[in-house]
Amino acid sequence: MTIAFQLAVFALIATSLILVIGVPVVFASPDGWSSNKNIVFSGTSLWIGLVFLVGILNSLIS
């Protein structure tokens, strides 16, 4: 169970870093938002899911 928790935390950190770098790049590029809107929403949905997963796994480990 600890390995699953560690992998989930790593995935959350990696997704956070990708979104922190990627979202401003999408907004700054010309015509970037309209063409990459689905990717940003998918990344945000993945991030929200990982936050809940880490919380659930943390409650099971503690």
UniProtKB/Swiss-Prot annotation:
It is found in: Plastid, Chloroplast thylakoid membrane. GO terms for cellular component: chloroplast thylakoid membrane; photosystem II reaction center. It holds the Pfam family Ycf9. Coiled coil: none annotated. InterPro entries: PSII_PsbZ, PSII_PsbZ_sf. Its main location: plastid. May control the interaction of photosystem II (PSII) cores with the light-harvesting antenna, regulates electron flow through the 2 photosystem reaction centers. PSII is a light-driven water plastoquinone oxidoreductase, using light energy to abstract electrons from H(2)O, generating a proton gradient subsequently used for ATP formation. This is Photosystem II reaction center protein Z. It comes from Piper cenocladum (Ant piper).
